[in-house]
Amino acid sequence: MAEGKQLPMLRPEKNPGQAPIFQRVGIVGLGLIGGSIALAARQIWPASLVIGVDRKDVLERAMVLHAIDVAADDAVVLADADLVILAAPIQQNLEILRELSENVTGAAVVTDTGSTKRAVVEAAAALPDRLTFIGGHPLGGAARGGIEHARPDMFTGRPWLFTPSKGHDAAALEKLKAFVAGLGAVPQALSPEEHDRLLAFISHLPQLTVSALMHVVGEAARDEGLSLSGRGLQDTTRLASSPADIWKETCATNADEIGSALDALISVLRQLRADLKTGKSIDDVFESANLWRETLLSNKGS
């Protein structure tokens, strides 16, 4: 990030709120997720200092929204932070991690919000002992990104996954769990490997499948054909509006697991293709899909 000049501090009058879990919360990346964390943290723990690091145009919007107390476009402002949240895109988080020990001078808990975990956990292994890294992934979001779409209730009732490494600091994990529970989220812990395997199936595969489906349908049907489509196609392809740049990073950092998930889907599609006339595979796949769909909806309370 450019010049490293701190922007003006902005601390309007606050309500007393809850006693802070962390005193100085540094958030690198004030997009949809980072911005929502900032908004919620300032509401819930007004005695905490929320420090935002991003481009100056983003910081200016964040200050107008009262999402942060201190703004800077350089990570040196994180020197005294006791919690650092890396909420930038995955590759940028990896770059920030490499220099974090130079910017954060004291002891701190460090976490991230990326959708893949093994790469960032491996990179964090090089951090000094005073910086305790525990990977994180809030399973919340919205159709549109950017701090202008951030909401303090973004994480209410949503899972927030943590991926502690072997021999992790149990006290740091408990503080992080308390922090995200304060944001309204439901903290859960699993290994980095299991996280990436599960997310490949429940998130990454659906995204690639929907994007591929919309590509094939659009190329075949064109404008005239799409004008005849019903609500089903719109509902099914909602994820096709997702930005490619974010998903390229996701695929690059979870290629093996996503590849396995794609292989599983391709195998079923081949079954269906080979059995179109008799319909045996269609019966089996539809029956299984109906049952798993009911399970999905019941788990979501729908």
Model feature map: region roles:
Residues R24, L49, T132, P159, ...:
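Residues at the starts of beta-strands that form the adenosine-phosphate
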Residues A87-P89, G114, P164:
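Glycine-rich, N-terminal phosphate-binding loop of Rossmann-like dinucleotide-binding domains
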Residues A75-V109:
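Rossmann-like NAD(P)-binding element
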Residues I96-A150:
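Rossmann-like NAD(P)(H) cofactor-binding subdomain of soluble oxidoreductases
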Residues P152-R238:
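Internal alpha-helical scaffold of NAD(P)-dependent oxidoreductase catalytic cores
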Residues R222-N290:
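Interdomain hinge/lid region at the active-site interface
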Residues A2-D74, A79:
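NAD(P)+-binding Rossmann beta1-loop-alpha1 motif at the extreme N-terminus of oxidoreductases
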